[in-house]
Amino acid sequence: MTVSVLPAFAIKWLVPRLGKFQQLHPHIEVRITTSKELTDFAKDDVDIVIRHGLGRYPGLRSWYLFAEDLVPVCSPKLLKGAASLRSKGAASLRSIRDLRNHTLLHDQYRRDWGLWLDAAHCTGVDATRGPSFSDDAAMLEAAIEGQGVALGRSTLIERDLMAGRLVKPFLITHNPSP
């Protein structure tokens, strides 16, 4: 069975669960391919495709798997550093408006920060500034390394939050699904 998924989804969600699937179904040989392209089932040797979206693909059967919230996350070091260095002029990260003094990390294909800031009723933060990444896993790694605050999808940040590699500076989430 060949499964095509987005790279970040493979790294952050699917691969950590693959071992349990293999234990339950040892007779199924699984091949994971990562791609950001739409799959052409007539040409590509793929059995299942998992993509992020609304699931409306003409001529294909699709299932809605789960909702994802957008959640601001950063390194615990960045959050502690902002607090401990405040007396030396470092930017605090106590309120959403404090994001204007921090680097925002972006997914280059989506404008999630603008949506999240609107949902949080926050003005005065430039939602377009900061580096953008072509892959969510790279963006989240930048956040883990203390390079800024990322807006992560809940399914992709779950394990990093549990392991303490990422923290939520704010409890406000946004679900962009219609």
For each predicted feature, which ranges?
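C-terminal regulatory
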Residues: F41-K43, G55-S177
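Central regulatory/effector-binding core of bacterial HTH transcription factors
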Residues: M1-P58
